[in-house]
Design a protein with these regions (language model features):
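N-terminal signal-anchor transmembrane alpha helix of single-pass membrane proteins
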Residues: 1-40
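N-terminal topogenic membrane-targeting module
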Residues: 24-120
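Amphipathic alpha-helical scaffolding segments comprising HEAT/armadillo-like alpha-solenoid repeats
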Residues: 68-72, 105-120, 141-152, 173-184, ...
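Membrane-interacting alpha-helical segments
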Residues: 85-87, 117-120, 124-127, 286, ...
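Structural detector for internal amphipathic alpha-helices that build alpha-solenoid repeat scaffolds
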Residues: 90, 96-106, 128-139, 161-172, ...
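Short inter-helical turns and helix N-cap capping residues of alpha-solenoid HEAT/ARM repeat scaffolds
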Residues: 122-123, 155-157, 187-188, 219-220, ...
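Eukaryotic acidic, Ser/Thr-rich intrinsically disordered low-complexity regions
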Residues: 339-377
Length: 377
């Protein structure tokens, strides 16, 4: 009887908890909708006023005391602050005013800096929101930059990401470089993909890319590889010379491989000699990627080097060598030249790639030379 009573009581308690949870969720949804409506209403009310002030700053006019007080009142209340941040986020994509947001926000620097201590103690979600908005405001002050640098060491990966992203959005190259060195020395990591996205914000900046190239050797291996990966997407030609010099001196295999990949995507006439040398590297990964990259640097000298690599002991090196050769010189004469040699593995890999690239030519050659070809078991 006691067991039945216990089970019945537990069931009632379980149903009660579920019922209360459902009521709470519904209440929270309604409360959120009400808050959103209030923020939307405030956004409509203050939008024109904020935009007028920004346009005034754009024309090099100072804001009046009343205009500054108007915005300060907005910033001191939670809901109106949310509405304000939405407007600033929208205007940051407006070509007419986007570059003057930082000048406009300097008028309210004291209020923003006073909130740093409060948000430093908040949970990661609220802290992320505040940090993200610092990036929108684009204010470069010692207190703000110092706070963002401290946030790079936060336990939350989202806080770390938003901190680095905001430093990048503020746009001070020296502070961004300082942040990267700090992260490297303290082994602070964020997701690789978002790290490259942040670096890519500066892909058109000659000055910052030159600084990134200058400090590469000060950074840890992983960060170097990610930055070199990012370099592949920009068109700063001076990077080619710098990375070629680094390739000649670099001893770390991972870094070297990323530089070789860079030269596959970014043609540089001076690089082909070094790429040919890499076909004799002690690391098969380097030999394989160099063989693939040489497809973009094709010449008589490159072809002869790749023919030798068809005999490499590693299958991937042979595969990439055959692919590079046939991509540039898929002729019956060249194929027969390789097939007439004694190396069985060179013949096999060339036929394997040929079958995938040009099945018609493969069948012709196979039928014509069938008696001469001995495939390995």
């Amino acid at each position: 009887m006691k067991i039945v009573s216990y089970i019945f009581f537990s069931l009632i308690l379980f149903i009660y908890v579920i019922f209360i949870s459902i009521i709470y969720i519904k209440f929270e949804k309604r409360a959120t909708k009400r808050r959103e409506k209030k923020v939307d209403k405030m956004e409509q009310e203050i939008r024109e006023g904020i935009k007028k002030q920004l346009l005034k700053v754009t024309k090099n006019n100072k804001l009046s005391k009343d205009e500054i007080l108007y915005v300060e009142k907005i910033l001191k209340k939670s809901k109106s602050r949310q509405a304000f941040n939405r407007i600033i986020s929208e205007l940051s994509n407006n070509q007419e005013v986007k570059y003057d947001i930082s000048i406009f926000m300097y008028n309210f620097l004291e209020i923003i800096e006073n909130e740093i201590e409060k948000y430093a103690k908040k949970d990661s979600i609220r802290k992320c929101y505040f940090i993200f908005n610092l990036g929108l405001y684009k204010i470069d002050s010692f207190k703000i930059q110092n706070f963002l640098m401290e946030c790079l060491n936060d336990k939350s990966i989202y806080v770390r990401y938003n901190a680095l992203n905001s430093i990048a959005n503020i746009g001070k190259g020296d502070k961004f470089i300082e942040a990267l060195i700090y992260m490297s020395k303290n082994r602070i990591y964020i997701n690789d993909k978002v790290f490259i996205e942040i670096i890519d914000k500066f892909k058109n900046s000659h000055e910052i890319n030159r600084e990134l190239a200058r400090i590469l050797n000060e950074l840890n291996t992983k960060m170097q590889c990610l930055i070199i990966n990012s370099f592949s997407k920009n068109k700063n030609d001076f990077l080619k010379e710098i990375l070629l010099m680094k390739l000649k001196d670099e001893s770390n295999k991972e870094v070297r491989i990323n530089i070789i990949k860079y030269f596959e995507k970014n043609y540089y006439d001076e690089a082909y000699v070094e790429l040919i040398k890499l076909l004799a590297s002690k690391w098969w990964e380097e030999r394989a990627i160099a063989a693939k990259s040489l497809s973009k640097y094709y010449s008589f000298e490159v072809e002869n080097s790749l023919k030798k690599s068809l005999k490499d002991k590693n299958w991937y090196v042979r595969l990439n060598s055959a692919s590079s050769i046939l991509e540039n010189n898929c002729t019956k004469e060249l194929i027969e030249e390789v097939l007439n040699e004694e190396d069985v593995y060179a013949k096999e890999i060339l036929l394997y790639v040929l079958q995938k690239k040009n099945n018609t030519l493969y069948n012709k050659i196979l039928n014509y030379k069938e008696e001469r070809i001995t495939l390995s078991c």
